[in-house]
Protein backbone atom coordinates (compact mmCIF):
# COMPACT_ATOMS: atom_id res chain seq x y z
CA UNK A 1 0.00 0.00 0.00
CA UNK A 2 1.34 3.41 -0.96
CA UNK A 3 2.54 5.55 1.92
CA UNK A 4 0.77 8.88 2.28
CA UNK A 5 0.38 11.42 5.05
CA UNK A 6 0.36 10.73 8.74
CA UNK A 7 -3.05 11.04 10.37
CA UNK A 8 -1.89 14.24 12.06
CA UNK A 9 -0.79 15.71 8.72
CA UNK A 10 -4.09 14.74 7.11
CA UNK A 11 -6.11 16.33 9.93
CA UNK A 12 -4.05 19.52 9.71
CA UNK A 13 -4.51 19.79 5.93
CA UNK A 14 -8.25 19.11 6.08
CA UNK A 15 -8.62 21.79 8.75
CA UNK A 16 -6.55 24.25 6.72
CA UNK A 17 -8.56 23.61 3.57
CA UNK A 18 -11.84 23.95 5.45
CA UNK A 19 -10.87 27.53 6.30
CA UNK A 20 -9.24 28.38 2.96
CA UNK A 21 -11.84 27.12 0.49
CA UNK A 22 -14.64 29.21 -0.99
CA UNK A 23 -17.69 28.17 -3.01
CA UNK A 24 -19.76 30.33 -5.34
CA UNK A 25 -22.88 29.84 -7.47
CA UNK A 26 -22.72 31.95 -10.61
CA UNK A 27 -24.53 32.59 -13.86
CA UNK A 28 -22.20 31.46 -16.62
CA UNK A 29 -22.96 34.64 -18.55
CA UNK A 30 -21.01 36.47 -15.85
CA UNK A 31 -17.89 34.33 -16.30
CA UNK A 32 -14.97 35.32 -18.51
CA UNK A 33 -11.90 33.28 -19.33
CA UNK A 34 -8.94 35.54 -20.03
CA UNK A 35 -5.50 34.71 -21.38
CA UNK A 36 -2.25 36.39 -20.45
CA UNK A 37 0.26 34.78 -22.74
CA UNK A 38 0.05 31.06 -21.96
CA UNK A 39 -1.72 31.67 -18.63
CA UNK A 40 -5.48 31.58 -18.16
CA UNK A 41 -7.61 33.11 -15.42
CA UNK A 42 -11.34 33.04 -14.70
CA UNK A 43 -13.12 36.29 -13.89
CA UNK A 44 -16.49 36.48 -12.12
CA UNK A 45 -18.26 39.71 -13.09
CA UNK A 46 -21.27 41.63 -11.84
CA UNK A 47 -23.93 43.19 -14.08
CA UNK A 48 -21.71 46.23 -14.65
CA UNK A 49 -18.73 44.14 -15.75
CA UNK A 50 -16.75 44.68 -12.55
CA UNK A 51 -14.99 41.82 -10.77
CA UNK A 52 -17.01 40.39 -7.89
CA UNK A 53 -13.94 38.54 -6.62
CA UNK A 54 -10.27 38.48 -7.51
CA UNK A 55 -9.49 36.74 -10.84
CA UNK A 56 -8.85 33.04 -10.29
CA UNK A 57 -6.34 30.53 -11.54
CA UNK A 58 -7.86 27.33 -12.91
CA UNK A 59 -6.86 23.81 -11.93
CA UNK A 60 -6.63 20.83 -14.28
CA UNK A 61 -9.82 19.22 -12.98
CA UNK A 62 -11.82 22.43 -13.43
CA UNK A 63 -10.46 22.82 -16.97
CA UNK A 64 -11.71 19.32 -17.84
CA UNK A 65 -15.11 20.06 -16.30
CA UNK A 66 -15.47 23.35 -18.18
CA UNK A 67 -14.69 21.56 -21.44
CA UNK A 68 -17.16 18.78 -20.68
CA UNK A 69 -19.93 21.23 -19.73
CA UNK A 70 -19.46 23.18 -22.97
CA UNK A 71 -19.12 20.00 -25.09
CA UNK A 72 -15.63 20.94 -26.26
CA UNK A 73 -13.73 17.72 -27.11
CA UNK A 74 -11.06 17.06 -24.49
CA UNK A 75 -8.17 16.67 -26.94
CA UNK A 76 -9.06 19.91 -28.72
CA UNK A 77 -9.49 21.74 -25.40
CA UNK A 78 -6.06 20.61 -24.21
CA UNK A 79 -4.46 21.47 -27.54
CA UNK A 80 -5.82 25.01 -27.37
CA UNK A 81 -4.78 25.25 -23.74
CA UNK A 82 -1.18 24.32 -24.51
CA UNK A 83 -0.79 25.97 -27.94
CA UNK A 84 -3.19 28.93 -28.11
CA UNK A 85 -4.66 30.08 -24.80
CA UNK A 86 -6.31 33.06 -26.51
CA UNK A 87 -8.24 30.77 -28.86
CA UNK A 88 -9.37 28.66 -25.90
CA UNK A 89 -10.57 31.77 -24.05
CA UNK A 90 -12.53 32.88 -27.14
CA UNK A 91 -14.15 29.45 -27.54
CA UNK A 92 -15.07 29.13 -23.87
CA UNK A 93 -16.46 32.67 -23.59
CA UNK A 94 -18.54 32.23 -26.75
CA UNK A 95 -20.19 29.08 -25.46
CA UNK A 96 -20.65 30.46 -21.95
CA UNK A 97 -22.67 33.31 -23.45
CA UNK A 98 -24.66 31.10 -25.84
CA UNK A 99 -25.54 28.42 -23.28
CA UNK A 100 -26.40 30.27 -20.05
CA UNK A 101 -26.63 28.15 -16.93
CA UNK A 102 -25.97 28.29 -13.22
CA UNK A 103 -22.83 26.55 -12.00
CA UNK A 104 -21.03 26.07 -8.71
CA UNK A 105 -17.34 26.92 -8.70
CA UNK A 106 -15.24 25.56 -5.85
CA UNK A 107 -12.13 27.58 -5.03
CA UNK A 108 -9.11 26.73 -2.89
CA UNK A 109 -6.10 28.99 -2.37
CA UNK A 110 -7.17 31.31 -5.18
CA UNK A 111 -7.58 28.51 -7.75
CA UNK A 112 -10.76 27.08 -9.26
CA UNK A 113 -10.58 23.40 -8.36
CA UNK A 114 -14.04 22.36 -9.61
CA UNK A 115 -16.75 23.60 -11.98
CA UNK A 116 -19.96 21.79 -11.05
CA UNK A 117 -23.73 21.71 -11.23
CA UNK A 118 -25.58 24.03 -8.88
CA UNK A 119 -27.23 20.86 -7.56
CA UNK A 120 -23.89 19.58 -6.26
CA UNK A 121 -24.21 18.51 -2.63
CA UNK A 122 -21.24 19.64 -0.57
CA UNK A 123 -20.40 16.66 1.63
CA UNK A 124 -16.90 17.79 2.48
CA UNK A 125 -13.81 16.02 3.77
CA UNK A 126 -14.04 17.78 7.12
CA UNK A 127 -17.53 16.36 7.76
CA UNK A 128 -16.55 12.85 6.66
CA UNK A 129 -13.32 12.81 8.66
CA UNK A 130 -15.09 14.23 11.72
CA UNK A 131 -17.61 11.40 11.49
CA UNK A 132 -15.23 8.48 10.93
CA UNK A 133 -12.03 9.22 12.85
CA UNK A 134 -13.64 8.99 16.32
CA UNK A 135 -15.19 5.65 15.31
CA UNK A 136 -11.85 4.30 14.08
CA UNK A 137 -10.30 5.35 17.39
CA UNK A 138 -12.80 3.11 19.20
CA UNK A 139 -11.63 -0.07 17.41
CA UNK A 140 -9.06 -1.92 19.53
CA UNK A 141 -5.58 -2.01 17.94
CA UNK A 142 -6.78 -0.33 14.74
CA UNK A 143 -3.99 0.93 12.47
CA UNK A 144 -4.22 3.81 10.02
CA UNK A 145 -2.06 2.25 7.32
CA UNK A 146 -2.27 5.09 4.84
CA UNK A 147 -4.12 8.34 4.25
CA UNK A 148 -3.85 11.16 1.75
CA UNK A 149 -5.61 14.19 0.35
CA UNK A 150 -5.05 14.83 -3.35
CA UNK A 151 -6.55 17.31 -5.79
CA UNK A 152 -9.17 14.65 -6.52
CA UNK A 153 -9.97 12.85 -3.27
CA UNK A 154 -9.38 12.25 0.41
CA UNK A 155 -8.46 8.71 1.48
CA UNK A 156 -8.34 7.07 4.91
CA UNK A 157 -7.23 3.41 4.94
CA UNK A 158 -7.45 1.56 8.25
CA UNK A 159 -6.78 -2.06 9.24
CA UNK A 160 -8.25 -4.15 12.06
CA UNK A 161 -5.46 -6.61 13.01
CA UNK A 162 -7.83 -8.64 15.18
CA UNK A 163 -9.58 -9.92 12.08
CA UNK A 164 -7.07 -11.95 10.06
CA UNK A 165 -6.71 -15.23 8.18
CA UNK A 166 -4.05 -17.13 6.21
CA UNK A 167 -4.68 -17.52 2.49
CA UNK A 168 -1.84 -20.04 2.38
CA UNK A 169 0.51 -20.93 5.25
CA UNK A 170 2.47 -17.80 6.09
CA UNK A 171 0.45 -15.55 3.77
CA UNK A 172 -1.64 -13.60 6.27
CA UNK A 173 -4.26 -11.02 5.36
CA UNK A 174 -6.13 -8.65 7.65
CA UNK A 175 -9.49 -6.91 7.30
CA UNK A 176 -9.78 -3.18 6.94
CA UNK A 177 -11.79 -0.33 5.52
CA UNK A 178 -11.20 2.48 3.01
CA UNK A 179 -13.03 5.78 3.34
CA UNK A 180 -12.79 8.09 0.33
CA UNK A 181 -14.49 11.28 -0.75
CA UNK A 182 -14.22 13.74 -3.60
CA UNK A 183 -15.01 17.43 -3.11
CA UNK A 184 -14.56 18.17 -6.82
CA UNK A 185 -17.19 15.99 -8.46
CA UNK A 186 -15.04 12.95 -9.23
CA UNK A 187 -16.91 10.43 -7.13
CA UNK A 188 -19.27 9.76 -4.29
CA UNK A 189 -18.48 9.26 -0.63
CA UNK A 190 -17.33 5.63 -0.48
CA UNK A 191 -16.76 3.17 2.35
CA UNK A 192 -15.27 -0.07 1.04
CA UNK A 193 -13.79 -3.18 2.66
CA UNK A 194 -10.01 -3.46 2.45
CA UNK A 195 -7.86 -6.59 2.50
CA UNK A 196 -4.33 -5.95 3.75
CA UNK A 197 -1.61 -8.50 2.94
CA UNK A 198 1.14 -8.53 5.54
CA UNK A 199 3.87 -10.21 3.48
CA UNK A 200 4.27 -7.22 1.13
CA UNK A 201 2.05 -4.50 2.65
CA UNK A 202 -0.39 -4.73 -0.27
CA UNK A 203 -3.88 -3.33 -0.03
CA UNK A 204 -6.79 -4.74 -2.05
CA UNK A 205 -10.07 -2.81 -2.12
CA UNK A 206 -13.25 -4.89 -2.39
CA UNK A 207 -15.04 -3.00 -5.14
CA UNK A 208 -18.46 -4.68 -5.02
CA UNK A 209 -19.35 -4.00 -1.38
CA UNK A 210 -19.37 -0.22 -1.05
CA UNK A 211 -21.55 2.08 1.01
CA UNK A 212 -21.82 5.31 -0.94
CA UNK A 213 -23.57 8.68 -1.10
CA UNK A 214 -23.70 10.70 -4.30
CA UNK A 215 -23.12 14.46 -4.18
CA UNK A 216 -26.55 15.40 -5.53
CA UNK A 217 -28.75 17.88 -3.67
CA UNK A 218 -31.27 20.62 -4.35
CA UNK A 219 -30.48 23.36 -6.84
CA UNK A 220 -28.92 26.54 -5.43
CA UNK A 221 -29.91 29.78 -7.14
CA UNK A 222 -27.19 32.26 -8.06
CA UNK A 223 -29.51 35.23 -7.50
CA UNK A 224 -30.13 34.18 -3.89
CA UNK A 225 -26.73 32.71 -3.03
CA UNK A 226 -23.52 33.97 -4.60
CA UNK A 227 -21.07 32.80 -1.94
CA UNK A 228 -21.90 29.59 -0.12
CA UNK A 229 -20.73 29.23 3.46
CA UNK A 230 -20.11 26.07 5.46
CA UNK A 231 -23.44 24.52 6.30
CA UNK A 232 -23.81 24.26 10.05
CA UNK A 233 -26.86 22.06 9.63
CA UNK A 234 -27.10 19.17 7.21
CA UNK A 235 -30.30 17.82 5.75
CA UNK A 236 -31.88 14.95 7.63
CA UNK A 237 -30.91 12.41 4.97
CA UNK A 238 -27.29 13.60 5.12
CA UNK A 239 -27.27 13.13 8.89
CA UNK A 240 -28.68 9.66 8.34
CA UNK A 241 -25.93 8.90 5.85
CA UNK A 242 -23.21 10.03 8.25
CA UNK A 243 -24.69 7.68 10.85
CA UNK A 244 -24.58 4.90 8.26
CA UNK A 245 -20.95 5.79 7.53
CA UNK A 246 -20.16 5.49 11.21
CA UNK A 247 -21.90 2.11 11.46
CA UNK A 248 -20.01 0.79 8.43
CA UNK A 249 -16.66 2.00 9.73
CA UNK A 250 -17.40 0.64 13.18
CA UNK A 251 -17.75 -2.81 11.64
CA UNK A 252 -14.27 -2.30 10.09
CA UNK A 253 -14.93 -4.95 7.46
CA UNK A 254 -17.68 -7.32 8.44
CA UNK A 255 -16.38 -10.76 9.39
CA UNK A 256 -18.56 -12.78 7.02
CA UNK A 257 -17.59 -10.61 4.03
CA UNK A 258 -13.91 -10.85 4.99
CA UNK A 259 -14.17 -14.64 5.15
CA UNK A 260 -15.85 -14.66 1.73
CA UNK A 261 -13.01 -12.67 0.12
CA UNK A 262 -10.37 -14.85 1.81
CA UNK A 263 -12.19 -17.84 0.33
CA UNK A 264 -11.98 -16.22 -3.11
CA UNK A 265 -8.25 -15.71 -2.59
CA UNK A 266 -7.70 -19.34 -1.62
CA UNK A 267 -9.63 -20.48 -4.68
CA UNK A 268 -7.66 -18.12 -6.95
CA UNK A 269 -4.36 -19.43 -5.54
CA UNK A 270 -5.28 -22.83 -6.99
CA UNK A 271 -6.13 -21.49 -10.46
CA UNK A 272 -2.98 -21.61 -12.61
CA UNK A 273 -1.87 -19.28 -15.36
CA UNK A 274 -0.79 -20.33 -18.84
CA UNK A 275 2.90 -20.56 -17.95
CA UNK A 276 3.90 -21.04 -21.60
CA UNK A 277 3.30 -17.33 -22.19
CA UNK A 278 3.14 -15.40 -18.91
CA UNK A 279 3.88 -12.02 -20.60
CA UNK A 280 1.03 -12.65 -23.03
CA UNK A 281 -1.47 -13.33 -20.25
CA UNK A 282 -0.39 -10.20 -18.39
CA UNK A 283 -0.68 -8.11 -21.55
CA UNK A 284 -4.19 -9.36 -22.30
CA UNK A 285 -5.28 -8.90 -18.68
CA UNK A 286 -3.86 -5.38 -18.72
CA UNK A 287 -5.98 -4.50 -21.73
CA UNK A 288 -9.04 -6.13 -20.18
CA UNK A 289 -8.77 -4.07 -16.99
CA UNK A 290 -7.61 -0.71 -18.33
CA UNK A 291 -3.92 -0.90 -17.48
CA UNK A 292 -1.27 0.84 -19.58
CA UNK A 293 1.60 -0.97 -21.27
CA UNK A 294 4.11 0.43 -18.77
CA UNK A 295 1.90 -0.64 -15.87
CA UNK A 296 1.66 -4.10 -17.39
CA UNK A 297 5.45 -4.32 -17.56
CA UNK A 298 5.77 -3.40 -13.89
CA UNK A 299 3.09 -5.91 -12.94
CA UNK A 300 4.86 -8.64 -14.93
CA UNK A 301 8.07 -7.94 -13.04
CA UNK A 302 6.35 -8.27 -9.66
CA UNK A 303 4.52 -11.40 -10.82
CA UNK A 304 7.78 -13.10 -11.74
CA UNK A 305 9.49 -11.94 -8.55
CA UNK A 306 6.56 -13.26 -6.51
CA UNK A 307 6.99 -16.82 -7.90
CA UNK A 308 3.21 -17.31 -7.94
CA UNK A 309 1.91 -17.91 -11.47
CA UNK A 310 -1.75 -18.12 -10.53
CA UNK A 311 -4.79 -15.86 -10.64
CA UNK A 312 -4.06 -14.93 -7.02
CA UNK A 313 -0.45 -14.18 -7.91
CA UNK A 314 -1.53 -11.86 -10.73
CA UNK A 315 -3.93 -9.94 -8.50
CA UNK A 316 -1.19 -9.54 -5.90
CA UNK A 317 1.26 -8.34 -8.55
CA UNK A 318 -1.17 -5.57 -9.47
CA UNK A 319 -1.61 -4.40 -5.87
CA UNK A 320 2.14 -4.67 -5.28
CA UNK A 321 2.78 -2.52 -8.34
CA UNK A 322 0.46 0.13 -6.88
CA UNK A 323 3.26 1.02 -4.47
CA UNK A 324 5.53 1.96 -7.39
CA UNK A 325 3.38 4.60 -9.08
CA UNK A 326 3.79 8.26 -8.20
CA UNK A 327 0.09 9.15 -8.11
CA UNK A 328 -1.77 8.20 -4.93
CA UNK A 329 -5.05 8.31 -6.88
CA UNK A 330 -3.74 5.82 -9.46
CA UNK A 331 -2.29 3.64 -6.72
CA UNK A 332 -5.75 3.47 -5.15
CA UNK A 333 -7.27 2.61 -8.55
CA UNK A 334 -4.80 -0.28 -8.85
CA UNK A 335 -5.85 -1.60 -5.44
CA UNK A 336 -9.39 -1.82 -6.83
CA UNK A 337 -8.22 -3.35 -10.13
CA UNK A 338 -6.33 -6.01 -8.18
CA UNK A 339 -9.61 -7.11 -6.62
CA UNK A 340 -11.45 -6.91 -9.95
CA UNK A 341 -8.86 -9.30 -11.42
CA UNK A 342 -9.24 -11.65 -8.46
CA UNK A 343 -13.03 -11.62 -8.88
CA UNK A 344 -13.17 -11.90 -12.68
CA UNK A 345 -15.48 -14.62 -13.99
CA UNK A 346 -13.59 -17.85 -14.54
CA UNK A 347 -14.76 -17.84 -18.16
CA UNK A 348 -12.89 -14.55 -18.70
CA UNK A 349 -9.75 -15.95 -17.05
CA UNK A 350 -9.92 -19.05 -19.23
CA UNK A 351 -10.37 -16.94 -22.35
CA UNK A 352 -7.35 -14.76 -21.51
CA UNK A 353 -5.18 -17.84 -21.09
CA UNK A 354 -6.54 -19.54 -24.21
CA UNK A 355 -6.08 -16.45 -26.39
CA UNK A 356 -2.54 -16.07 -25.08
CA UNK A 357 -1.79 -19.69 -25.95
CA UNK A 358 -3.23 -19.25 -29.46
CA UNK A 359 -1.21 -16.10 -30.06
CA UNK A 360 1.95 -17.86 -28.89
CA UNK A 361 1.24 -20.82 -31.18
CA UNK A 362 0.60 -18.48 -34.14
CA UNK A 363 3.83 -16.54 -33.58
CA UNK A 364 5.83 -19.78 -33.30
CA UNK A 365 4.30 -21.09 -36.51
Give the ranges of each region predicted by the language model.
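Short, amphipathic alpha-helical segments
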Residues: 72-99
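Internal, hydrophobic cores of structured domains that mediate oligomerization or house catalytic pockets
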Residues: 91-231
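Charge-rich, low-complexity amphipathic helices
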Residues: 88, 154-158, 267, 271-275
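Intrinsically disordered, low-complexity regions enriched in serine/threonine
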Residues: 1-82, 164-363
Amino acid sequence: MKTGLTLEQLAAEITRQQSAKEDYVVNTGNLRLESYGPDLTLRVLDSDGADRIEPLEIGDIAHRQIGTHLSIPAKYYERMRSEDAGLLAHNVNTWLERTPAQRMIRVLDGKVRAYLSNRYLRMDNYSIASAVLPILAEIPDVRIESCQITDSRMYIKAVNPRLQEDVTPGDTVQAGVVISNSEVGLGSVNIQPLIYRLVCSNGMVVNDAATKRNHIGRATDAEENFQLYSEKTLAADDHAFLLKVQDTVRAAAEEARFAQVVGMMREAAAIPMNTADVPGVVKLASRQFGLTDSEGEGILQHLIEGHDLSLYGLSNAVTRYSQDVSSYDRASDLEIIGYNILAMPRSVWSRLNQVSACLLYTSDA
